[in-house]
């Protein structure tokens, strides 16, 4: 339990101090943001800071810090170190820079920013790569929730039914102004994601039924199939440490920020929140089951 508490504390301290340091180095100021100067009522729409944070959290998280962290837990408590240090020094910086660079470049996407600095060839490469990446992520973030919803609803509402519902929702959310659907629904889902993590953490901390193993007693690879920590643990836990996919999402909220001063809370803060969620689920993975073999079989 002490390891878990120290890791959560480290993430919070990292947000407060290292996140502020990153913000200071970047030099956020009081200049007008694209949400103000390019306000079109569609993509560039000023939104409240707390809404932007929750939308950003849901955009970058989804099921990633749950599935990824649980798979990462197969390696044992050593996964905690990757989540903590990856979030503070890699993921948080990556997401912050992507969001702030977009804000400084009139809300440009990651591919357009790449083209600005690396030329037209890399612009086209990043456009193709981004489309492929988004299709792959879209498939995962469609099939996963559809399967879960099918388990929670009557048998006639199978995974195929929910998959179509999700796809239709995607199209609606994409074609209407960002504050009409995404800005209204995503904050609710973001709160649900946080509440779920708090609930699981509460069980871990206050239930005597589960024992959280300490890192110092389990500082070795516990994967039941002897899969190497390097590089597999680091690519297994992406959402929850660092994920390049986030670069495609941060510009969406960069177009809604009303001040560059929101960058620390929205971009770095959402990544730290995702790291905390990943920590909770990784701890659940190593605690709820007798060993990593039982977790794998589950």
Set out the residue ranges of the language-model regions:
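Membrane-interface "cap" regions at the ends of multi-pass membrane proteins
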Residues: 10-66, 262
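Helix-loop-helix module between adjacent transmembrane segments
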Residues: 10-11, 15, 90-106, 110-175, ...
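Membrane-interface helix-loop-helix modules in multi-pass membrane proteins
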Residues: 47-105, 116-117, 267-291
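Small-residue-rich segments of transmembrane alpha-helices in multi-pass membrane proteins
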Residues: 117-120, 124-125, 188-203, 271-276, ...
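Hydrophobic alpha-helical segments and their helix-loop junctions in multi-pass secondary transporters
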Residues: 138-142, 146-164, 174, 194-221, ...
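Helix-loop-helix junctions that connect adjacent transmembrane segments
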Residues: 187-190, 196-247
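Junctions where cytoplasmic loops transition into the N-terminal start of transmembrane alpha-helices
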Residues: 188-192, 249-282
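Extracellular/periplasmic helix-exit of transmembrane alpha-helices
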Residues: 205-214, 261, 272-298
